[in-house]
């Protein structure tokens, strides 16, 4: 590898809004603030919501006079 052309690879801390602190290494060179992490993201915590689009489909079919398949 060429000398002097690569960014410095340093240890940083990434702090989540929930308070979780993650120590990692990066070329960013400064500490990061995260909005979500694995401890508070709804997908990983099991609090994920399913968006119901059934009403939208029925409204579309009604608007364009498409008979329902149910």
Swiss-Prot record:
Binding site for Zn(2+): 16, 18, 37, 40
Superkingdom, taxonomy of origin: Bacteria
Cofactor section: Zn(2+)
Keyword GTP-binding: no
Known partners and oligomeric status: Part of the 50S ribosomal subunit.
Stated role: Binds the 23S rRNA.
Protein name, per record: Large ribosomal subunit protein bL31
Protein source organism: Actinobacillus pleuropneumoniae serotype 5b (strain L20)
Source lineage: Bacteria, Pseudomonadati, Pseudomonadota, Gammaproteobacteria, Pasteurellales
């Amino acid at each position: 590898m060429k000398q002097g052309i690569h960014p410095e690879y340093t240890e940083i801390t990434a702090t989540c809004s929930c308070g979780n602190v993650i120590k990692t290494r990066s070329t960013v060179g400064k500490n990061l603030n995260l909005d979500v992490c694995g401890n508070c993201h709804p997908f990983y915590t099991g609090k994920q919501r399913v968006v119901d689009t059934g009403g939208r489909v029925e409204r579309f079919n009604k608007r364009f006079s498409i008979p329902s398949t149910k």
